[in-house]
Amino acid sequence: LGDVYKRQDQGTVYTSSCSSDGVALFNVEYGYYTVAVHYQSASGIIFSGRLESLSLLPEQGEEVMKVQLQLARSKINALVIKEIYYVGCKGELGADYQADQYVTLYNNSDETVYLDGLCLALVDPMPGIVSPWVKYTDMKRIPVADMTWQFPGSGKEYPLLPGAETTIATNAVDHTGGEYQHANSVDLSKVDWGFWHVSLSKQNIVPGVKPLNLLLNLNSTAWMYSFPVVGPTFMIFGFEGISAEEYVNNPLNRENRSQASNKTKFYLMIPKEWVIDCAECVENEAKLANKRVPDELNHEPVYIPEGDYSGKSLIRKSAASTNGRFIYQDTNNAAEDFIVSKPSLKK
């Protein structure tokens, strides 16, 4: 096991490896710390834990302090989020532009993955606030923010071969040409899929791009679908042992935000065991504590230092190559698994 102490007021990071009995020793300065532990076995099982706020103050003396972390268990995924471009860019005449967002999924295994029936969604809430779900619930179920999107297909219509990827755009058009002319943007007219539905009047898609199914929309006033530029938490999941329609239409699978004043606003709740992969993003370093999901889904959020509308993307690190097929790093820790880069679709 590897442990990390990070001083919150200065950003100083201390690292150490655990002994055979799971003990890591640190000699650190007084301050306020975030403590994290992570281990990945050869079989692909991941153990991780995190303590958000640990105070080490002079009045506590210089005696050794013992800190115990509860570990969460997870596993490496076959289907991973390879890239997520959400911050937007500076559009024509320097205006903020975010209609060009997309996410890319990748088959990180040596077996064919079928997309049929799998779902994509954002996790509630946006990262600017402390999650009431994390604060007040056990997080055994993950709240979906408004819309749940699903790949069509009856089971084996949409294969994704080992080392293959597929991209889904919020607006599947060429944002650099035609009526758009945003030179800093990307051409999304040739992607595979689009987040598009006839009820969303501001979504755009070109012929040849397949629309996902809008499985459920719990925001009847929405006229578009976009990722928050301040950092989305994006997840892939699949239904197990029940049809998608039966599950989403059961009122027992919808909840209010804990402690919320609005009792008419509901969110679809997904068992955390159904989540295949998750990318947890926040706006900046100051928001890293605003987690949306438990550690077994993602250990630490990631952010783009250049900020909103910077034209930057988050791309998963390549860990190895086998017979010409890239294998991407997947430790369920977005802060370690992704790097900031220009969008892969940017010419």
Question: Which residues are covered by each model-predicted region?
Answer:
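A structural motif detector for short, solvent-exposed N-terminal "entry" segments of globular domains
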Residues: 71-127, 210, 219-231, 241-253, ...
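Structured interaction patches on ligand/partner-binding surfaces of diverse proteins
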Residues: 12, 41-66, 70
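Short beta-strand and strand-turn-strand segments in soluble, beta-rich domains
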Residues: 9-11, 46-51, 132-155
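A short, solvent-exposed beta-strand micro-motif common in secreted/extracellular proteins
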Residues: 28-44
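Short, small-residue-biased leader/transition segments that mark boundaries at the very start
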Residues: 1-5
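Short, surface-exposed beta-strand/beta-hairpin micro-motifs centered on an aromatic residue
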Residues: 19-28
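Solvent-exposed beta-edge/loop recognition patches
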Residues: 140-337, 341-346
